[in-house]
UniProtKB/Swiss-Prot annotation:
The lineage of its organism: Bacteria, Bacillati, Actinomycetota, Actinomycetes, Mycobacteriales. It is found in: Cytoplasm. CDD domains: MobA. It is an enzyme of class 2 (transferase). This is Probable molybdenum cofactor guanylyltransferase. Its cofactor is Mg(2+). GTP binds at residues 12-14, 24, 71, 103. The gene is mobA. It comes from the Bacteria. Pfam families: NTP_transf_3 (PF12804). It comes from Mycobacterium avium (strain 104). Its main location: cytoplasm.
Length: 197
């Protein structure tokens, strides 16, 4: 693990995928991975242990080397799922967790290394990449933020921005932002496939 930090991985896979029209977790994966979920878990496995996949109730998932945690209620957004994942990571002894979306076909372990390095230097509660915009779902979060998330959710918050605004967050400017690309539509998927060809 980078900088010898105990680092968990959390993959948010339970989103509704409205723009895509089908479950992103089961989309074809890059570099020989059968699905996007398998690819993202494979990347996280290189830097994170344990790994948790946050999934919707009843959502079918491919077999992966990760613990599956089901949302209690469908469609609540990423904040409650992140809180449950951070709580599980804290219980497993991790101080930080890399939290990402399942729809990142160019994700790289080097991105995680860059975030861990800044977290080690600053002890920030959140370290997130910036490439003209903040990427909340490709960031490092301290696991002790689970309680704060519970309070935010109890107050009606559902977006990750609410957590960032209530935290000591540090941003890292990335010279190479392609690792942050995500797929939201069939056109995005085709464009990435063509770029890899």
């Amino acid at each position: 693990m980078a900088d010898s930090m105990q680092l968990a991985g959390i993959v948010l896979a339970g989103g509704e995928s409205r723009r895509m029209g089908r479950d992103k977790a089961t989309l074809p994966g890059p570099r020989g991975a059968a699905t996007l979920l398998e690819y993202v878990v494979g990347v996280l496995t290189q830097r994170c242990d344990p790994i948790f996949v946050m999934a919707a109730p009843g959502q079918p998932l491919p077999e992966v080397s990760a613990r599956i945690i089901r949302d209690e209620i469908r469609g609540q957004g990423p904040l409650p799922a992140t809180g449950r994942g951070l709580r599980a990571a804290a219980e497993a002894g991790a101080r930080y967790a890399f939290v990402c979306a399942v729809d990142m076909p160019l994700l790289s372990p080097e991105l995680i290394d860059d975030l861990v390095h800044l977290a080690t230097e600053t002890n920030a509660e959140v370290v997130l990449p910036w490439d003209g915009r903040s990427h909340y779902l490709a960031s490092l979060y301290r696991t002790d933020l689970a309680e704060r998330i519970d309070r935010l959710v109890a107050g009606g918050a559902r977006s990750m921005r609410a957590l960032i605004d209530a935290s000591d967050a540090q941003q890292i400017v990335l010279p190479e932002s392609r690792f942050l690309a995500n797929v939201n539509t069939e056109a995005d998927l085709r464009a990435l496939a063509q770029a890899r060809a």
